[in-house]
Amino acid sequence: MKFKILFTIILFVFASLGSADELRNAVESKDRSEKNIVRDEFRKPYETLSFFQLEPNMTIVELSPGGGWYTEILANFVRKSGNLIAAHFSKDSERAYFRNSRINFEKKVKENNLYEKVTVVDLNSELSDPSSVDAVLTFRNLHNWLGPNMDKIFSNTYIALKPGGLFGIVEHRAKVGTSMEAMK
């Protein structure tokens, strides 16, 4: 009996180390751009993504990936056994910045095999089939959604997540006393 318990604990520890190694490999990958690697010192991607306890076989949604800074790491992390869904601005947005951001992101995804497991969807649409996603992540975007968009994005997130799924939010810190109106 003691052997079985010890064996189970050892298996769990090694399984956890495997995920950590795969995450570290994704963060330290030669596939990452120098421009993005320079930001690691400030964004601390290994520590951030480790906190979320992600596994490489997960289906992960990244909300508002922008130029793909975290996408570059996440795509590599899930490449062998998981999936990454990038929920980006609509191609039909009235704002040229949003349209161009989406066009540039899709071009980046199509031109590099690193992104072969990345699917791009509209941020304000269904993210995936209901209860099919292990984790939804967003990085420094929440303040951009203040207002009616936030309700839609949160609702779509809730619908897409599996029971017990993770919604991970990394956000800027406002100065103490900053009003919600000033953050909009």
What are these regions (language model features)?
Residues E126-V136:
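A short acidic, Gly/Pro-enriched loop at the edge of an enzyme's catalytic core
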Residues N57-G66:
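Conserved class I S-adenosyl-L-methionine
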Residues I85, G164-H172:
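Conserved beta-strand signature within the Rossmann-like core of class I S-adenosyl-L-methionine
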